[in-house]
Amino acid sequence: MPTMGNKNSMCGLKRFPNYKKSPIGSFAKNSSSHDGIKTIEAVNSCSFSRKADLCIRIITWNMNGNVSYEDLVELVGKERKFDLLVVGLQEAPKANVDQLLQTASSPTHELLGKAKLQSVQLYLFGPKNSHTLVKELKAERYSVGGCGGLIGRKKGAVAIRINYDDIKMVFISCHLSAHAKKVDQRNTELRHIANSLLPRDKRKRDLTVWLGDLNYRIQDVSNHPVRSLIQNHLQSVLVSKDQLLQEAERGEIFKGYSEGTLGFKPTYKYNVGSSDYDTSHKIRVPAWTDRILFKIQDTDNIQATLHSYDSIDQVYGSDHKPVKADLCLKWVNS
């Protein structure tokens, strides 16, 4: 089996030598199944060998057309125990975001590839000199139409397909149609994006990750009770009203995918520059619009552990909070 990871990866730490994990697909009391999505709790420990692991930090952020270097530094983080860094952006400004991201992620990581569809963007970073491990890299994009192109905030998706150290991965960053009533339209957009950007041959992808502003909202709950529950740290009550999970339960989207528990507060909509929810005349109902989902194609060959799934509340430059996931892969019997 191929050798993955680096000695500084989060799975190379020796603090948790006795931790044992179940392969994805056999999560016991820490998981709940839907027809479309398996919801799993993140674990804070890892027993993967430093010679047989690949750790990936995945970040999605709707930037609302704004950028500051300080926000990007906070986004990337100072602790770099991951191998690959995947950053998906929506409503990215016309400023040279890729250069700022490269500066923020140096000196530990370098840009391996990027994909852009105007304001929908995706960046993939690897450890310095890791480009030698890249056997294939392809960037693709798909537009779902609309007038977003006229105002520089396009809806659609971009993808990076990569073979990194013999692990074939597809990362898709997308921005779907807004507003609570457009559930069916979002479902249709997801199907069109999948048909366009995912390889037909499933053997060409060991790991598939969707990230982005998927724009699914809280269904049939008005603004005041939603905000009251969040204020009292009872946002978990709202999970059953999440449109994305509801559509997954109906079998409409993301069949066979996994997502971390929605333990963090809804990531939209905030007053820019603060952690206060929207007080404008629109007064949007808070929602988990920003999500990260993943799927292992063959769990007999590769196991996955989700180590974190959370929002990054210390970023204030947008009306969305970023979301990050730390995912580690392990070859079975390596």
UniProtKB/Swiss-Prot annotation:
Q: Which GO terms describe its cellular component?
A: plasma membrane
**What InterPro entries does the annotation carry?**
Endo/exonu/phosph_ase_sf, IP5, IPPc
GO terms assigned for molecular function: phosphatidylinositol-3,4,5-trisphosphate 5-phosphatase activity; phosphatidylinositol-3,5-bisphosphate 5-phosphatase activity; phosphatidylinositol-4,5-bisphosphate 5-phosphatase activity
Q: Where is this region: Catalytic 2?
A: 282-297
Null mutant phenotype reads: Alterations in germination and in dark-growth seedlings. Elevated level of Ins(1,4,5)P3 and InsP2 levels.
Which terms under GO biological process does the entry name?
Answer: phosphatidylinositol dephosphorylation; response to abscisic acid; response to auxin; response to jasmonic acid; response to salt stress
Q: What induces it?
A: Induced by abscisic acid (ABA), jasmonic acid (JA) and auxin. Up-regulated in seedlings and down-regulated in mature plant by salt stress.
Its annotated compartments are: Cell membrane
What EC numbers are recorded for this enzyme?
A: 3.1.3.36, 3.1.3.86
Going by the record, the broad EC class of this enzyme is hydrolase
- Hey, what tissues is this thing expressed in? Expressed ubiquitously.
PANTHER family reported in the protein's UniProt record: INOSITOL 5-PHOSPHATASE (PTHR11200), LD06095P (PTHR11200:SF275)
Function description: Has phosphatase activity toward PtdIns(4,5)P2, and in vitro toward PtdIns(3,5)P2 and PtdIns(3,4,5)P3. Cannot dephosphorylate PtdIns(5)P, Ins(1,4,5)P3 and Ins(1,3,4,5)P4.
Q: What is this protein called?
A: Type IV inositol polyphosphate 5-phosphatase 11
Source species, please? Answer: Arabidopsis thaliana
Q: Which gene encodes it?
A: IP5P11
